[in-house]
């Protein structure tokens, strides 16, 4: 193991030079996309060069015009940085206590928090980031009137049962959209339940292919998670069944239609423990989602506003 670490370190230093610092983030796709938004802000200020960014999704960065070095996540690289006395920045926007199941959020939007932790100052855009080639975008057009629906987040690396919305309601949403003449595509993990009547692409796309499909879709309807962030990164309008677990101001986007439930216990920031039978999700009916989706489809072609913040 030591020999491997030494060989890895020598190879990286020879190829990329001495790092100014090493940056790592959470394991989720959405977290990585929000990190990409913060890195973009670092890059436009000319301060991304010389930084090693550790990624669990290398394909997100191929290609990229951003400065910096993007390396597959490896704890050996962190150990190397520590031996070289290079700063290691561990990005995060909450502190999770497994004993209480409580995810205590840091103040502000996650992208703003990441920017602050990276030393970015001034006006920033609260938008995740991915670059697609024209050929990739063209490949995302699968059907004439395509919309994307995600009916579960159970396939996430850190699944949160408090985000669950009943499967039968998702099936009714799918039926209504198909009744409107739309081609409903289901994206997500093969571990998630099939959506009745949808074109099933669960587990059959890469992250970049999913991004391209979203980029060429009229609408995304889904839950808080990686696909929500991916849709925002490619400017796909979205209706998000948010519920009440968290405030959209933490990691959501004003460009989306965010459907929230606000019982007295909300926001709770629990991951799996709900003593109230997910009342915040139950408050959102399928008619609410269908109405919101139809409203967004009627506004097709509108330029999506970009949220901003100022980091002091």
Where are these regions (language model features)?
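Catalytic machinery of carbohydrate-active enzymes
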Residues: 1-312
């Amino acid at each position: 193991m030591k020999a491997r670490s030494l060989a890895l370190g020598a190879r990286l230093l020879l190829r990329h030079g001495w790092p100014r610092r090493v940056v790592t983030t959470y394991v989720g796709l959405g977290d990585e996309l929000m990190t990409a938004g913060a890195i973009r802000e670092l890059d436009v200020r000319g301060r991304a060069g010389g930084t090693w960014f550790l990624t669990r999704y290398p394909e997100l960065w191929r290609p990229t015009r951003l400065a910096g070095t993007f390396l597959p996540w490896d704890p050996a690289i962190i150990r190397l940085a520590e031996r070289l006395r290079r700063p290691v920045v561990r990005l995060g926007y909450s502190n999770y206590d497994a004993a209480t199941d409580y995810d205590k959020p840091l103040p502000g939007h996650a992208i703003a928090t990441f920017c602050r932790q990276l030393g970015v100052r001034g006006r920033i855009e609260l938008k995740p980031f991915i670059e697609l080639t024209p050929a990739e975008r063209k490949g995302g057009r699968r059907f004439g009137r395509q919309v994307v629906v995600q009916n579960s987040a159970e396939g996430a690396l850190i699944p949160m049962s408090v985000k669950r919305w009943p499967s039968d309601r998702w099936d009714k949403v799918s039926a209504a959209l198909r009744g409107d003449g739309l081609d409903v595509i289901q994206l997500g993990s093969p571990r998630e339940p099939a959506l009745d009547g949808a074109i099933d692409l669960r587990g059959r796309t890469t992250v970049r292919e999913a991004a391209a499909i979203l980029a060429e879709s009229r609408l995304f309807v889904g839950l808080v998670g990686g696909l929500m962030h991916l849709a925002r990164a490619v400017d796909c309008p979205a209706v998000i069944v948010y519920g009440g677990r968290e405030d959209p101001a933490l990691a959501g986007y004003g460009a989306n239609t965010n459907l929230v439930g606000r019982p007295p216990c909300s926001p709770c920031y629990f991951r799996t423990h709900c003593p109230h039978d997910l009342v915040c999700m139950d408050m959102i009916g399928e008619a609410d989602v269908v109405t919101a989706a139809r409203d967004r489809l009627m506004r097709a072609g509108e330029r999506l506003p970009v949220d901003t913040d100022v980091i002091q």
